[in-house]
A protein has these predicted regions:
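A conserved hydrophobic secondary-structure block that centers on an alpha-helix together
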Residues: 113, 313, 317-321
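Metal- or metallocofactor-binding catalytic centers and their adjacent structured scaffolds
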Residues: 163, 267-304, 311, 478-481
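C-terminal or mid-to-C-terminal helical accessory/interaction module adjacent to the motor/catalytic core
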Residues: 90, 96, 103-104, 149-246, ...
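Basic, low-complexity terminal or inter-domain segments flanking catalytic cores
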Residues: 2-4, 163-167, 187, 191, ...
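Intrinsically disordered, low-complexity regulatory segments
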Residues: 1-188, 486, 497
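Structured, non-catalytic alpha/beta "coupling" segments that mediate domain-domain communication
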Residues: 30-67, 220-269, 367, 425-472
Length: 630
């Protein structure tokens, strides 16, 4: 019996073949660059000893497009919302290799990434195989389930395959068709509109990226977040406020210490109100210590690592873009060093042997001794569990040890070290401390002072990306004692504007609002940057994302049109689509139903956009004029 196995990437194909064959394969070149065919034998429990060929694709091998008669300029853009589509083979040599190898295969086993996109690529592989072997169908094609390249895990995946998830295939097909129809129709509409405008066209020539005004159902809500924050910063008007502060001079360990107390009411924007309270306070030369509370406190170790948290932390800690972080994680996964990096799961399965993974890291000079403490000194703790489980992959974690000096570049080193340290922190105890809170009553008002003493750093000893330090020790206050007020003052402050958008904030907003998935968020940010809709700028060492003139004009233009029951710049419609796609996966609705409903909404928006194109152009012109005449 012959079994054809197909992976999503050449590196995965090579690694899986090496494991299943016991490092004994016959390698054949193909006409497709980077792709090899590996021949070997493997004993499948249900089939016995089989001849196996392991090969791969390089992502998608087909895509959907419109027939030639619907190409740019040959039909009105609005026609694309209901025009026929056709499937096009985008990688002919890869497609033909699968078809040739499937000709003599009895069974097809899919080894693509275990997510929706991987499921659809598996379907594409099946279609290529059926070209020469119609006996291969969705009812008998096998699908391996794996999340990393550890030997026993791969052997288990080979021996316990499932079937393709056809609902996931339909969900991806639905998303691809909607992205094509909506993206192409609006892109052609906007581009034609702006090219015909002398003002817009002259401005766009400054940046070749802007010659095509590309629209995407995820990119525009993402851009909308950035524009919204920019406008909040720009329109911010600072307000004065007033508050009361108190300092007590105390002797502490032989030294005079000034202890600041904070007003429990915070601050007020009414100066007269605060003045009256302050006058009542200063009539009392003494204050009374009403409470002294000492209680244990903890700084919780992190939850197991998800894709979104990986991207946010790499942006915050290493100033690395979300795309660069995910690309580095993908390379580490392909090399077998970490688990699959696209996951929403923040809880480890109970049956997973985490101590074995810790043991593999014991040889490292940086964190090896810490691993030994976890394993041999009773410091290991079961990781906390979050609320999310995508049922496909565990949290991101190290699978095999990698010496940092052997990794190709700094980004790989930083991401690998972060993944390892995060994992070890998850398996550690929370940091422990004591929080000392003193309450002072001055007149009728209450003020508090706090002091933190860190007793045991625990996970913080291996996780340097978070700071939790002891504050200056508070003197020994006694409950009920009176103290002379040495520094009671009424002070003035003013409100500060919000900061412009940072990439970690943007990732969090996209995740919370259902814009894209954990796996595609980075790509959407990259696209709006590459298309010239936003620019990145550094201020005082922090990188912010600001809208360009074009990005601002597009969002404000769509907002001025005031669509009925829809917004092209807000996240609601895309979030609704993502929820509908999940319903397709769950079997609660159909691809056809979702297509009908969503296309109808976008059709209404398209008609209004076409009718009110002058509003879009005017919004862009207003932005240019305001920047030229500030």
């Amino acid at each position: 019996m012959k079994i054809l196995c197909v992976a999503e990437k050449p590196s995965i194909s090579k690694a899986v073949a090496k494991i299943l064959s016991g490092e004994s394969t016959r390698t054949r070149k193909t006409r497709a660059k980077y792709i090899m065919n590996y021949d070997f034998k493997f004993n499948f429990p249900q089939y016995g000893l089989c001849d196996v060929t392991m090969t791969s694709v390089v992502g998608h091998i087909t895509n959907i497009d419109f027939p030639p008669e619907y190409s740019w300029g040959k039909c009105p853009p609005g026609r694309l919302l209901e025009a026929p589509t056709l499937e096009v083979v985008s990688q002919q040599d890869v497609f033909k290799n699968i078809a040739n190898e499937a000709r003599t295969a009895n069974i097809l086993m899919i080894w693509t990434d275990c997510d929706r996109e991987g499921e659809f690529i598996g379907w594409e592989i099946l279609q290529a195989a059926r070209l020469t072997n119609p006996s291969l169908t969705s009812e008998n094609v096998l699908r391996s389930q794996f999340s990393h390249l550890e030997r026993n895990h791969i052997l288990h995946a080979a021996k316990n395959p499932l079937l393709l998830d056809l609902n996931a295939v339909k969900a991806v097909s639905c998303r691809m068709e909607l992205d094509l129809r909506v993206g192409a129709s609006f892109t052609r509409l906007l581009t034609d509109l702006f090219r015909k405008s002398s003002v817009a066209n002259a401005s766009m020539d400054k940046d070749k990226k802007s010659n095509v005004i590309s629209y995407g159902t995820c990119q525009f809500p993402t851009l909308g977040f950035i524009v919204d924050r920019y406008l909040r910063v720009k329109s911010f008007v600072s307000e004065k406020f007033w508050y009361i502060s108190v300092d007590l001079k105390m002797e502490n360990d032989g030294e005079v210490q000034l202890v600041p107390f904070t007003w429990t009411r915070g601050h007020f924007f009414d100066r007269l109100f605060v003045t009256l309270i302050y006058q009542d306070c200063i009539a009392n030369p003494f204050g009374k210590i009403t409470k002294v509370i000492r209680k244990p406190t903890s700084n919780w170790r992190p939850l197991p690592l998800t894709t979104v948290e990986l991207q946010k932390d790499c942006a915050r800690i290493f100033k690395m873009s979300a795309k660069d972080a995910l690309d580095a994680a993908e390379k580490l996964y392909n090399k077998g060093f970490i688990s699959y990096p696209r996951t929403e799961t923040d809880q480890f399965p109970q049956a997973m042997d985490l101590k074995e993974l810790i043991g593999k890291q014991s040889q490292d000079t940086r964190w090896g001794s810490y691993c030994s403490e976890l394993l041999h000194e009773g410091k290991y703790r079961t990781p906390r569990g979050g609320k999310n489980d995508d049922k496909a992959h565990p949290p991101i974690h190290p699978v095999n040890y990698a010496n940092l000096s052997a990794l190709d570049n700094d980004k790989l080193k930083k991401v690998y070290e972060y993944v390892v340290r995060r994992f070890l922190a998850c398996c550690s105890d929370d940091a422990k401390g004591e929080l000392n809170t003193v309450t002072l009553q001055w007149g009728k008002e209450e003020f508090t002072a706090t002091g933190l003493a860190v007793i045991a750093k625990n996970y913080l000893n291996v996780y340097p990306y978070k700071k939790w330090e002891s504050s200056k020790k508070l003197p020994n206050f006694i409950e009920g004692e009176s103290r002379s007020i040495t520094g009671g003052k009424m002070k003035e402050g003013k409100t500060s504007p919000p900061n412009h958008m940072t990439e970690p904030e943007l990732i969090g907003l996209m995740d919370a609002n259902g814009i894209g998935t954990d796996a595609t968020i980075a790509e959407h940010i990259f696209k709006i940057t590459n298309r010239g809709y936003v620019v990145k700028t550094k201020q005082r060492g922090t990188e912010y994302i600001l809208p360009s003139e074009l990005g601002m004009g597009l969002i404000q233009g769509f907002d001025r049109i005031e669509f009925e029951n829809i917004s092209l710049s807000k996240p609601f419609l895309r979030k609704r689509l993502e929820n509908s796609l999940q319903e397709i996966v769950d079997g609660r609705t159909t691809k056809e139903q979702v297509l009908r409903e969503v296309i109808q909404l976008y059709r209404q928006a398209f008609v209004q956009s076409a009718q009110k194109g002058n509003i879009l152009l005017q919004a862009y012109k207003d932005i240019i004029d305001s920047n030229n005449n500030p």
